[in-house]
Structures are given as structure tokens and as C-alpha cells.
């Protein structure tokens, strides 16, 4: 395309927000991050219109988009505004879930509130305060109020800071297990009936639990908690409220023992979905299907979300992306600068292909969650190539 064909004031990039805002979360330092915020509104002859200044390739490639927060607070704010652009009443959320960064388990459980009918994206408080990114996001989102939550604009979960000036309802519980039960109780009341399935995950090993957040956001199934060898009373009570549901235990025996699985079987039909490590576990969950439960992503034409196991709060922050748009499961990296071989193999398995015309094919898309300390641009570029549609006579990635 020739520049002469473009209006003189254009060459604009739309981008998702992102600076670090956390003070007391479990996220590692971000000193190694190198990406810059893109410049909006640059003219084509400006020096600022260079690809790096416009944000390419870090913020977007042909098949990937990055929410480049230095922490989960910024990522959640960016995701919420990507899912709800809030330019008019129809593009605003009705309510928002506000969770503190102090407990990743509560955040993962709160992802359930993104499911219908509440459709509440998640924002974070930090140490009893609202970070600037959260305040700004709330001010832009301006939730309209959810009648299923008593007209609340904000659902304050646990010890989250108060959002002054917004009609708020509180979800309370003594600990993460009790809060998960209370979150599920609110979702059940809003939906009018309990879901037929629940997810049970390890409260001790976040890498195995992270993929549950996106599924909860899509399905409305609760994420309930156990230790390796025990089931909290609140979890038992929450499962019982679903009247012998299908119980899907996410993670291997090293995370949730057979003894616990056997005990869960007394409360409903219990089944394990697992991989030997967090990377393999996430892939197993992405592939899994049992009736109406499970992603069943075993062929091309899907969205996928990528996050780093070192940032468990990002799973909750990103959950709305699994419940809107291209939908899709969470896959995991264990290091920013390396794409695990099992993830590469899985992406090759679901890579789109075409016979004669790529326009007649289906397409994959990937969301990168976090800055370059979470997902390096080199890894993003490799993922982009693995997502690209290919001629069927060539099995090679672009």
C-alpha cells in the first residue's frame, strides 16, 4: 500500500494499556522489560511512526495481540477495556469484580463472575488501595449496574479495597476456600440454578490451577480448592450445593492426591484432568472434552491465551479473553524467553491449513499476557508463526 493513498493524519495504532502498578503482589520485578508504549496518532512522515515506536512487533503481530502489563493489575485493566471498550452504554460492563492481589486463589475463583449473566471483568486492588490503573479503568468502564447483583456496579470480593462512588455488593469469606464458595453462591443466584459441573484445583500449586480461570469465565463453573491431601469444609459445602455435580480435578496426583479424588467421588462424579507439569497440564485441559465440559481445542480455528507460570494472577486478569472474542484456553510458559516443546507441538497440531485459497480457511489467534519479562518478543514471534495458516502441501510454519 502506498502512503499517498492514506489520509495525511493517519497511520494510527490502537493499543492496550500498560504500565506496572503493583506494590504488594506476588509478581517478580520487571526491570528487564524493554517494550515502549506505542505512540498514537503519528503521521506517516514522523520519526515516531517507526515500527518500534508504533509498538510492532511487541504489541501486535498478524496473529497475536499483547496486553503488556508489567504486573497483573495493569493486565487486568487492559483486558477489561479490550473486552469492554465502553464507548457507549452497549459496550460497557454491567458490573466489575474487584479482588485484592494478596491471594491468587481468590482471583482465580472470581473469574467465574465473568460468565453469564453477570459478565464481570476483574480488576485488582493492592494492599487495601486502588492502584491508578484500576481507578482509571473503572472511570472509563463506568459499569451500568447488574440487576442480578442488586444493581451493583462493583462486586467487592474479600479484602479488596472499596471503590468510592460506585454501588457495591460484597462477597465475604474467612479464607480462599470460603470465598470461592461465596463467589459460587453469588453466581448461582444470578444464573438461577447451580451449574452441573465444578472444577477442583490445588490451592498449593498455582501452575496447575491457572488454566481453570479462563474456563470458569466461559462456563460459569466454580473453581473450588483442596490441598493435596485434604478437602476444606467450605469446598465440601460448595460442591454439595450443586447436588452431585460432575467434579473435574485439575492436576496430577502430585497436586491432588488419589485419596482426595476418592473423597470427592462421594460428592459427585469425580474425574481427573492432568498433565505431569503445569505446561502439559494446561495442554491436557485445552484438549479435554466430556459432554458440555471442556475446551475440546483439537483442531484449527481457535483463540489461545499465553501466560507465564511465575505470574499466577495473570490467569485471572486474562480470563475475560477466554470468554469473549475468539474464546480459548490458557497455555503456559515457564520462562519468558523459551517456548516449551509441548506447546510448540500442540500449536502445530492445531495449526490452520488451506488447500487453494487461505480466505476459505479458519484462523487462530493468540493473546500474550504481560510484558517481555513474562513473554519475550522472540517467543511471541515464534507463536505467531505457529498460528499462521499454511498451505496443506507444506507442513512448515511461516
Q: Can you name each region flagged by the protein language model?
A:
Residues 23-398:
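Extracellular glycan-binding segments that recognize GlcNAc-based cell-wall polysaccharides
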Amino acid at each position: 500500500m502506498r502512503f499517498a493513498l492514506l489520509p495525511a493524519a493517519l497511520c494510527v495504532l490502537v493499543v492496550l494499556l500498560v504500565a506496572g502498578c503493583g506494590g504488594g503482589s506476588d509478581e517478580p520485578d520487571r526491570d528487564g522489560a524493554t517494550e515502549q508504549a506505542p505512540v498514537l496518532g503519528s503521521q506517516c512522515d514522523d520519526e515516531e511512526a517507526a515500527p518500534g515506536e508504533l509498538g510492532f512487533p511487541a504489541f501486535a503481530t498478524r496473529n497475536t495481540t499483547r496486553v503488556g502489563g508489567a504486573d497483573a493489575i495493569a493486565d487486568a485493566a487492559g483486558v477489561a477495556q479490550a473486552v469492554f471498550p465502553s464507548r457507549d452504554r452497549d459496550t460497557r460492563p454491567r458490573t466489575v469484580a474487584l479482588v485484592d492481589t494478596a491471594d491468587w486463589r481468590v482471583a482465580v475463583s472470581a473469574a467465574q463472575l465473568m460468565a453469564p449473566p453477570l459478565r464481570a471483568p476483574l480488576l485488582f486492588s493492592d494492599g487495601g488501595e486502588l492502584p491508578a490503573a484500576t481507578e482509571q479503568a473503572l472511570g472509563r468502564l463506568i459499569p451500568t449496574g447488574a440487576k442480578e447483583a442488586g444493581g451493583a456496579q462493583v462486586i467487592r470480593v474479600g479484602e479488596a479495597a472499596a471503590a468510592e462512588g460506585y454501588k457495591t455488593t460484597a462477597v465475604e469469606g474467612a479464607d480462599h476456600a470460603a470465598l470461592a464458595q461465596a463467589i459460587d453462591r453469588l453466581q448461582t443466584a444470578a444464573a438461577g440454578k447451580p451449574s452441573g459441573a465444578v472444577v477442583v484445583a490445588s490451592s498449593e500449586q498455582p501452575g496447575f490451577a491457572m488454566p481453570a480461570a479462563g474456563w470458569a469465565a466461559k462456563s460459569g463453573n466454580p473453581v473450588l480448592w483442596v490441598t493435596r491431601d485434604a478437602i476444606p469444609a467450605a469446598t465440601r459445602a460448595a460442591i454439595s450445593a450443586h447436588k452431585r455435580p460432575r467434579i473435574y480435578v485439575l492436576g496430577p496426583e502430585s497436586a491432588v492426591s488419589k485419596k482426595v479424588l476418592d473423597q470427592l467421588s462421594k460428592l459427585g462424579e469425580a474425574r481427573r484432568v492432568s498433565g505431569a507439569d503445569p505446561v502439559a497440564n494446561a495442554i491436557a485441559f485445552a484438549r479435554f472434552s466430556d459432554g458440555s465440559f471442556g475446551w475440546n481445542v483439537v483442531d484449527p480455528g481457535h483463540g489461545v491465551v499465553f501466560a507465564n507460570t511465575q505470574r499466577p494472577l495473570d490467569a485471572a486478569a486474562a480470563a475475560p479473553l477466554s470468554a469473549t472474542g475468539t474464546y480459548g484456553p490458557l497455555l503456559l510458559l515457564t520462562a519468558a524467553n523459551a517456548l516449551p516443546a509441548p506447546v510448540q507441538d500442540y500449536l502445530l497440531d492445531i495449526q490452520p491449513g488451506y488447500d487453494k485459497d487461505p480466505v476459505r480457511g479458519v484462523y487462530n489467534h493468540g493473546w500474550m499476557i504481560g510484558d517481555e519479562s513474562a513473554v519475550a518478543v522472540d517467543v511471541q514471534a515464534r507463536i505467531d508463526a505457529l498460528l499462521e495458516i499454511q498451505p496443506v502441501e507444506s507442513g512448515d510454519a511461516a
